[in-house]
Amino acid sequence: MSEYIHTKAYLEPQELYEYTSKKGVAKASGSLKYMLSLGFLGGAFIAVGYLAYLKVAGSIPHEFGGLGGLLGAAVFPIGLICILVGGGELITSNMMAVTLAFFNKKVSLRMLVKNLFIITLANLVGAVFVAYFLGHVTGLTEGATFAKTLATAESKVNTTFWQGVFSGVGCNWLVGMGAWLSFCAKDVSGKIIGTWFPIMTFVAVGFQHVVANMFVIPAAMFGGANITLMQFFNNMCVIFLGNFLGGAILVAGLYTIAYKTNN
């Protein structure tokens, strides 16, 4: 009789910390074409997830209360799932993983800043590409959906500085945990489940994600919204700051305090 060997389908927290640090090193060490191509895909995938959110949430009558937001939030995670399972680079998950590798002294500050800068630009191009060609040109973010697109975009640009910062913190605490749990799982189903619920939660709550905003604000602008480029830029800066604090401190920082060894 052959001996039954049980293999865990997940990593223990200490193992997960070391694995995430290695992932951060790999992300920071990638070539320029690696970062640009996967960064474009990362921005585009998040935008497609947001497009699905707008179509679903915008089609539910107001009489059903929060059902539209809940159902929209349920389909949004497809974007991050495509990134974490299929391949892509997302600035918010890199704020967690690459910063963790920096805290673990595996990457330099220069490598960290370079990675965040390049991935942010590539995400922006991917998100705006989807907003224009798959949203505006096709009409999917306009017509019957435009009321939802406009209301969502205006709510983003009209937040105060501190509202935006802490909304960004809450968002990337959850997005960082979505990436963390995806890294934890060893099979595809585990990665999908680990990603789904934290991402669904941040969308249902209404926290702000810098790459998601790279899609929805331009989508509204392409449709004729009275939103200026300066408002868009200001929102990007504020939400980027909040997202960085959430991913770098509440995920990477606290797990480094808990699990970093002296080796």
Question: Where does each model-flagged region fall?
Answer:
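Alpha-helical transmembrane segments and their helix-helix packing motifs
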Residues: S2-N263
